[in-house]
C-alpha cells in the first residue's frame, strides 16, 4: 500500500503519474490502484488530472474532442472522475471546445486546460502556469497557492533559444553517413 509508506515520512503531497492509455490492459491495475487510493484518502485529499490529446484535423480545420470524451467515459466506468483535464493540442482550444469537454466529461470549464505544443520542452511549465494549473489544483485541494517566481526559468529558456555562442561538435562513428544512426 503506497500511501501507508509515504505517510510515515510526513509527506504532505504525493504526485503520482500513471502513464499509458486509459483503454490499454496494461494500465488497468494502476488505474484501479489510483481509484482505491483516492477512496482511502478521500476525494478532498486527492485530485485526478487527466492528460489527453485533442487531435487537430488540418483538412477540416477542426479539433476533435471525441477521443477525450471516450477516455473520460472509460475512467468514469472504472469509478474514476478526473478533477482537471489537460488537453494536449497543436492548436489553441476556444471556449466552445472547452465547454464541450466540460459538459461531456463532467468537469468545470475552468478545469479544462490547454497544453499547446511547444518548441522547447522546458517551455511546458510556463505554458501550464499560463493556464493556471497550479491554482486550479490548489483550489481543488483547498490549499493556498502563492504565485511562483519563474524569472530564472524564463531566463534559462531564453538562453536555450538564443545562445550567445555557436559550438561545432564532431560526431565520430562508423555509420555517420546514415542520417539517423546516432539520434
Give residue ranges: language-model regions.
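N-terminal beta1-alpha1 cap of cysteine-dependent amidohydrolase-like domains
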Residues: 1-13, 18-183
Amino acid at each position: 500500500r503506497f500511501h501507508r509508506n509515504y505517510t510515515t515520512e510526513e509527506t504532505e503531497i504525493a504526485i503520482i503519474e500513471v502513464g499509458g492509455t486509459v483503454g490499454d490492459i496494461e494500465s488497468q491495475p494502476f488505474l484501479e490502484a489510483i481509484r482505491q487510493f483516492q477512496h482511502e484518502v478521500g476525494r478532498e485529499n486527492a485530485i485526478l488530472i487527466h492528460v489527453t490529446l485533442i487531435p487537430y484535423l488540418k483538412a477540416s480545420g477542426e479539433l476533435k474532442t471525441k477521443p477525450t470524451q471516450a477516455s473520460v467515459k472509460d475512467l468514469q466506468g472504472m469509478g474514476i472522475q478526473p478533477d482537471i483535464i489537460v488537453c494536449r493540442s497543436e492548436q489553441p482550444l476556444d471556449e466552445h471546445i472547452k465547454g464541450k469537454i466540460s459538459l461531456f466529461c463532467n468537469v468545470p470549464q475552468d478545469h479544462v486546460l490547454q497544453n499547446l505544443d511547444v518548441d522547447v520542452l522546458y517551455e511546458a511549465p510556463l505554458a501550464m502556469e499560463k493556464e493556471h494549473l497550479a491554482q486550479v489544483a490548489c483550489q481543488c485541494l483547498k490549499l493556498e497557492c502563492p504565485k511562483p517566481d519563474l524569472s530564472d526559468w524564463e531566463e534559462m529558456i531564453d538562453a536555450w533559444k538564443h545562445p550567445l555562442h555557436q559550438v561545432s561538435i564532431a560526431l565520430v562513428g562508423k555509420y555517420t553517413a546514415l542520417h539517423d544512426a546516432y539520434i
